[in-house]
Regions:
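ATPase catalytic-site recognition across NTP-hydrolyzing enzymes
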Residues: 19-110
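Short boundary motifs at domain starts and secondary-structure transition points
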Residues: 4-6, 95-102, 155-158
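Short beta-strand scaffold segments in enzyme catalytic cores
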Residues: 119-125
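A short acidic Gly-Thr/Ser loop motif
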Residues: 112-117
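Hydrophobic/aromatic beta-strand patches that form the interior of the parallel beta-sheet core
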Residues: 13-16, 110, 167
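Short, intrinsically disordered, charge-balanced linker/junction segments flanking boundaries
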Residues: 267-270
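Signature of the SF2 helicase/ATPase Hel1-core->accessory helical subdomain module
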Residues: 1-21
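Mg2+-dependent endonuclease catalytic cores in nucleic-acid-processing enzymes, primarily RNase H-like
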Residues: 130-263
Length: 270
């Protein structure tokens, strides 16, 4: 018993629980709100406590932990908290001033994904042979392209070079299911300009075939392309989850990224 008690004195009990098991304290409305606000994968990990690792046979199988990095400007954060400008109770959102990987004198490159239920902006800057994915944004349901652009502009309000290099392909032309009248490209450019940003629009043509995209991306992760992608861990947790969980499906035209999970209907009432 003495030996057992000695081991117990330095032991730590660790167990992971789903938030559903704490439903009585959290309340049903909290769970519903989290399901509405978070991406499906983030809801699975942060609320349901399900572990999602990098799929070894997935679409982005060459991604490794080394492709993630931390870039918090702790000197800036310490100064803000010590001065009382920021506090845990203030609820004030962080901005790009808290990021140490942003070159404020260089343009920000962006790519976007347009969907009826969720719209994304992924922002990056090249740094030598690195492509640093510095931040990603998403909006869901009634919040569409104007809102995700506004979120971007708010976060990067102190960025000195207010230029975005907007890469888009044919999917941004002639489609408007995420907006009212104009196509995606027009709305993106219009919204950035309305917020005082300059847009350098770069048309990429038709979308790449999935097998070509797979080869390009995984060669990039392996350092065999001009740029190797790296992800700011704190600013891309939802994006990293999506990348790690992306699978591969095979059909008559070869393999492709499995978008089965992306196609599942998700309503505001779910």
């Amino acid at each position: 018993d003495r030996n057992l008690n000695q081991m117990r004195s330095v032991a730590v009990y660790y167990k992971e629980y789903s938030s559903i098991e704490n439903l009585q304290l959290l309340g049903e409305n909290y769970i519903k709100q989290m399901k509405r606000d978070l991406t499906p994968l983030t809801f699975q990990t942060s609320i349901l406590c399900q572990r999602i690792g990098i799929a070894k046979d997935g679409f982005y199988s060459s991604m490794r932990e080394g492709h993630k990095y931390n870039a918090s400007d702790f000197e800036f954060l310490d100064e803000k908290f010590k001065s009382g400008e920021w506090s845990a109770e203030s609820g004030e959102a962080f901005t790009c001033d808290a990021d140490s990987d942003v070159n404020k004198d260089a343009p920000i490159c962006i790519g976007m994904d347009y969907n009826a239920n969720i719209n994304w902006i992924v922002a990056g800057q090249p740094d030598g042979r690195r492509l640093n994915v510095i931040k990603s944004f998403y909006v869901k349901f009634e919040r569409k392209i104007p809102e995700v652009v506004a979120d971007f502009c708010t976060y990067y309000a102190s960025h000195r070079n207010k230029t975005v290099v907007y890469y888009y392909d044919a999917t941004a032309l002639g489609s408007n299911y995420a907006v009212n009248e104009q196509d995606f490209r027009w709305v993106v450019v219009h919204e950035f300009e309305r917020h005082g940003w300059t847009v350098e629009a770069v048309y990429l043509g038709n979308p790449m075939r999935h097998d070509e995209k797979y080869l390009l991306i995984n060669q990039g992760f392996a350092g065999k392309q001009r740029l190797m992608p790296f992800f700011n861990r704190q600013n891309n947790d939802d994006l990293i989850l999506a990348i790690q969980a992306a699978g591969v499906s095979r059909g008559r035209n070869g393999f492709r990224k499995d978008k089965g999970g992306e196609k599942l209907a998700e309503s505001e009432e779910d």
